[in-house]
Amino acid sequence: MMQWEKLYYVGAKAKQSGVMQGELAAELIHSDRRVNRNRDGKIQYVVLEGEPGHQDSIIRTENAVDTLKNNGIELEKLSYGVANWNRAQAQNRMMQMIGQHSNEIELVLANNDDMALGAIDAYAKLNITESAFPVFLGIDGTDAGLRAVMDAKLAGTVYNDKEGQAAAMAKLAVSLVSGSVPEDMEFENGRYIYLPYYKVTIANAEECLEKPGK
């Protein structure tokens, strides 16, 4: 980044997305005792991860789990599956985990919406009744993910403000061409612009889906 004075990074922090996913899960668990179906005082969960060793995947998972624990949720990890951010792979991995753990699974944390939707696909393919579904949570706020939240299939997601990032990149590019840097943009370490994630539930999913610039 320091090799060229006009090189900048615009994006979001993976840690924040994991923290917010954990907060969504904790809020739901505290507000709805039915999540803990076997009433053993702890939440049995599985994780669907992106590609092995990927920094965002590791950070999202660690921070989601740590946030749940910091909110007083006792956890038991049953399993995890690597699905490379892919819906079809997530369906296959989830079917394997259902085969191993059946109705023990109470929470599915997916590193992105596509994998969360793949997990839901697995339950549907196995003809498991929705009343026996665990809680599913994703990250990114894709159109498909937002629609699943609106349909109450996905309990929540964490919205990656790609429209805000695109606007920031366009504004920065125009300024750099004119030989200046916008004074109203916040930079970290001089070269990094981070746009915040935000939590999405059924209460605001439609608003996110209809966001200008999509």
Predicted segment positions?
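Active-site-proximal beta-strand/loop segments in catalytic clefts of secreted hydrolases
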Residues: 1, 12-13, 48-51, 80-84, ...
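Loop/turn elements at helix/coil->beta-strand transitions in domains of secreted/extracellular proteins
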Residues: 4-6, 42-44, 70-77, 102-106, ...
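Hydrophobic alpha-helical segments within soluble ligand-binding/sensing domains
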Residues: 10-42, 90-91, 141-145, 161-180
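Extracytoplasmic ligand-binding site segments that recognize negatively charged/polar headgroups
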Residues: 12-22, 43-67, 76, 83, ...
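Sec-exported extracytoplasmic/periplasmic mature domains
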Residues: 23-31, 65, 69-73, 95-103, ...
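Hinge/cleft segment of the Venus flytrap/periplasmic-binding protein
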Residues: 42-52, 56, 67, 164-214
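Hydrophobic alpha-helical
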Residues: 63-64, 76-148
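Exported/periplasmic ABC-transporter solute-binding proteins
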Residues: 121-163, 167, 171-187, 194
